[in-house]
Amino acid sequence: MMPTLAPPSVLSAPQRRCQILLTLFQPGLTATMATFSELNGVDDDIASLDISETGREILRYHQLTLTTGYDGSYRVEGTVLNQRLCLFHWLRRGFRLCPSFITSQFTPALKSELKRRGIARNFYDDTNLQALVNLCSRRLQKRFESRDIHFLCLYLQYCLLQHHAGITPQFNPLQRRWAESCLEFQVAQEIGRHWQRRALQPVPPDEPLFMALLFSMLRVPDPLRDAHQRDRQLRQSIKRLVNHFRELGNVRFYDEQGLCDQLYTHLAQALNRSLFAIGIDNTLPEEFARLYPRLVRTTRAALAGFESEYGVHLSDEESGLVAVIFGAWLMQENDLHEKQIILLTGNDSEREAQIEQQLRELTLLPLNIKHMSVKAFLQTGAPRGAALIIAPYTMPLPLFSPPLIYTDLTLTTHQQEQIRKMLESA
């Protein structure tokens, strides 16, 4: 069979993948390679790459699998909860990347399926749904942007369709307690009662839990205004986290409240992700851990009590982002961004790498280490702004130079103390 040929697609790769994913969630449609090729205006080779990348993304971020049936059709497999959270993410992304697809294809398909199932129109009428969202807005004292209102109306229709089909997410005990403790749970129960009165049938107990999670994920944490009991508890937990980090690292922060506020905004969302197995970008940790090993280890140790309190284990990606926040605030306390350490290089890259790693282990603070060949250093001297020269090779000393420390392989205790003192001085 000859592959389908098509002119270059006008859509970007993220747009194509978003349309693929939303098509897979579109009710009443069997999607094959040909479906995606035609949808995105690409040939089969590009469509295949897009499908593979979409599969990798939903596996990484939502623990879902993209499978192929005997007829060549694709489907998303995994728990109902993970599938709903996946659609939450991609549908919101779709309103930015491919709004015309949502308007012209996803929405009509959803409404058509609701009608086909015989669900009363007043359940999914746009006016009624907007009134329900506005009621939630007033109860939560949160103003939804027009895009969020549009998203919620559409997403609630998808949940209604699943509810009617007897498909409901399952929560483990920890997830259940978390959802029940959030500000949005009372509003979610109200939505459940609304559906129950109109449908004259009981609402599964986990459905209001999901509605609470849905609305809580739309809320941007605000350390100055959030006043719910769980928000106050989180602020206290973060204070203990910062105290623990300060003790472990023997450091101080000039604006500890500012640090706590930033950690609150981040960790409020990180807890949601960790409790519900939502992944984040995994490109940071390996390189970051190599550059700032002591900062990463200290952050992980400081987080142990926080994780125990909430019954979670933050992934390396999540703890790496917390380390970035701590590192940024440590740099504000110091003048490290103005300093440079010059590591002289020659013909022994392994020795140089070991010495650089020792330097990075000396301090929590991010280091600005630049490499410069011995030959260039002897010819031109130290670069402007260099605060310290580390020389792994014997050589003639220049007449003028910043402080220079020679080490064969292992920094002595005295050298470590001197370097640390120099680096951590303001």
From Swiss-Prot:
Pfam families: PRD (PF00874). This is Stationary phase-inducible protein CsiE. InterPro entries: BglG_antiterminators, PRD, PRD_sf. GO terms for biological process: regulation of DNA-templated transcription. Residues 120-225, 229-336 form the PRD domain. Disulfide bonds: none annotated. Keywords: Repeat.
